[in-house]
Regions:
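Carbohydrate-associated surface elements
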Residues: 157, 176
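Conserved donor-binding/catalytic core segment of Leloir-type glycosyltransferases
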Residues: 186-216, 227
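Nucleotide-activated donor-binding/catalytic signature segment of Leloir-type glycosyltransferases, i.e.
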Residues: 236-255
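Short alpha-helical donor nucleotide-sugar binding micro-motif in glycosyltransferases
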Residues: 254, 263-268
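Aromatic "clamp/platform" in nucleotide-sugar-dependent glycosyltransferases that forms part
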Residues: 276
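Short hydrophobic beta-strand element within catalytic cores of glycosyltransferases
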Residues: 293-296
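A charged, aromatic-enriched C-terminal amphipathic alpha-helix characteristic of glycosyltransferases
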Residues: 331-358
Length: 367
C-alpha cells in the first residue's frame, strides 16, 4: 500500500511531530508498505530515507515560530498527489492542508487526519473569550470531520473536542517511544536535584512555567538546578529572566543526537512538561522510558500518558508535583516510570495506524 503523508511545521530542529513521522514511516516501510512523506523546507528535494521517500517542497517561514514553514503551493501539491496515486492519505496538519481531504474524496482515496494538537486549547490561548473560542473550534472540527474518512487522536484528551461535536469517524491510536535508545542509566551521585525541561520554547508550550517551578523550589530551600533542552522564539526572554532572578539554568539548545538527549533525560531527577495544550507529549514519554518521573500540566493530555509514574499540577507552578515525586523512594519512582513507558512501544503504534489505513501489517509494497 502506498501511504502518502503530508505535514507542516516539520523542521530539522523540531521535536515530537518529526519523531512521530520518522518512526511511523519506518514502521510502514518495515511492514512492506510504501510511505511517502511531503513536508515544507527552504528548497525542493526528493530523497530515499529510513522512513521511505521524503519529498520537500519549498515553503514560506511562518512569522514568530522560530523557523517553521508551511506548504502553500496547492497546485504543485495537487499535481504531486496525482502523480503519486496514493492508496491512502495521512495528513498531520490542520492549517494550510485542510483541503486535501476533499481532494482524496474526489479521487476515491482513503483520507486520514491525525490530530496532533487541540484546536480548542490553542484558540483558547489566542482568544480571551471562552465562548467564541469554543464555537470557532467546533466549527473547524466539524469541517475536518466531514472532509476526512477517519480522524486519529492519540489520547482521550485530544479526542474530547471531536467527541463534543459528535464526530462518528474518530479513532484512538497512541504514539510510542524508542525503548532501546531511551532507557534507564546507572544513577550518578550529585549534589542537589536536577530538573530537565525538554521541548520547544514557544508560547503554547508555556516554558516559563518551568522557571517558575525552579524558583519556587529554591525559595523553599531545595538545592535544585535545571537544564533546558530545546530552542524557539522565547529562548532569549527565558535566558534574560533566569539571569535576572539568579536561577541556575543551563540552556542546552536543541539536542540533535538522540543518545545525547537520552543521557540527559536519564540523568534528571524530574522531567517537567508544563504545556497545557499537549495532546500526547513524546518528550515526556522519552523521559519516562529513561526511568525519570514526569511532572506535567494537569490541563493537558499528559496525565493520561504519565499515569502514576509522576504527578500533574494545574496552574503556573509545578513545584508541588516535584515535591510529591521526590518524596517517593528513588528506585521505586524510576522503576514505575520505565514500566509506564513500556506500554507505549512504536510497534504497537504502527499497527494501530495501519489498521486506520485499512492496511495489513505484512502487505507487500504496491508497484
Amino acid at each position: 500500500m502506498r501511504i502518502v503523508r503530508l505535514a507542516n511545521f516539520v523542521a530539522p530542529r523540531s521535536g515530537g511531530l518529526r519523531t512521530a513521522l520518522r518512526e511511523l514511516g519506518a514502521g510502514y516501510l518495515a511492514a512492506g508498505h510504501e510511505p511517502v512523506l511531503i513536508i515544507p523546507g527552504d528548497r525542493d528535494a526528493d530523497e530515499q530515507t529510513g522512513q521511505g521517500r521524503v519529498i520537500t517542497l519549498r515553503g514560506p517561514r511562518v512569522p514568530c515560530t522560530g523557523g517553521y514553514r508551511v506548504l502553500l503551493r496547492r497546485r504543485r501539491i495537487t499535481r504531486l498527489l496525482t502523480e503519486l496515486r496514493p492508496d491512502s492519505l495521512e495528513v498531520s496538519d490542520r492549517s494550510t492542508l485542510r483541503w486535501t481531504g476533499r481532494w482524496a474524496r474526489r479521487h476515491g482515496v482513503r483520507a486520514v487526519m491525525v490530530s496532533h494538537e487541540s484546536l480548542a486549547a490553542l484558540i483558547g490561548m489566542a482568544l480571551p473569550w471562552p465562548g467564541p473560542a469554543r464555537i470557532l473550534a467546533d466549527r473547524l472540527n466539524r469541517a475536518t470531520s466531514r472532509a476526512y474518512d477517519r480522524i486519529v487522536c492519540t489520547t482521550g484528551w485530544a479526542a474530547a473536542e471531536f467527541e463534543r461535536i459528535g464526530a462518528r469517524n474518530l479513532t484512538r491510536a497512541p504514539l510510542g517511544v524508542d525503548l532501546d535508545t531511551f532507557r534507564p542509566r546507572r544513577p550518578q551521585a550529585r549534589d542537589g536535584v536536577l530538573l530537565v525541561h525538554c521541548g520547544r520554547l514557544s508560547p503554547e508550550k508555556k516554558p516559563q512555567r518551568s522557571l517558575t517551578t525552579l524558583a519556587s523550589l529554591r525559595a523553599e530551600g531545595l538545592r535544585a538546578r535545571m537544564v533546558v533542552a530545546g530552542d524557539g522564539p522565547l529562548r532569549d526572554r527565558l535566558e534574560r529572566r533566569a539571569a535576572a532572578e539568579g536561577l541556575p539554568v543551563t540552556f542546552a539548545g536543541f539536542l540533535a543526537g538522540r543518545a545525547e538527549l537520552a543521557a540527559l533525560l536519564g540523568s534528571a531527577d524530574v522531567v517537567l512538561a508544563p504545556g497545557p495544550a499537549e495532546t500526547f507529549g513524546l518528550a515526556a514519554l522519552e523521559g519516562l522510558a529513561c526511568g525519570t518521573p514526569v511532572v506535567a500540566s494537569a490541563e493537558s493530555a499528559l496525565p493520561e500518558v504519565v499515569g502514576d509514574a509522576g504527578a500533574s499540577v494545574a496552574g503556573e507552578d509545578l513545584s508541588a508535583g516535584v515535591r510529591a515525586v521526590l518524596a517517593r523512594p528513588e528506585a521505586a519512582r524510576r522503576a514505575a516510570a520505565r514500566a509506564r513507558a513500556e506500554r507505549f512501544g512504536w510497534a504497537a503504534a504502527v499497527r494501530a495506524f495501519l489498521v486506520v489505513h485499512g492496511a495489513r501489517s505484512a502487505e507487500r509494497t504496491s508497484a
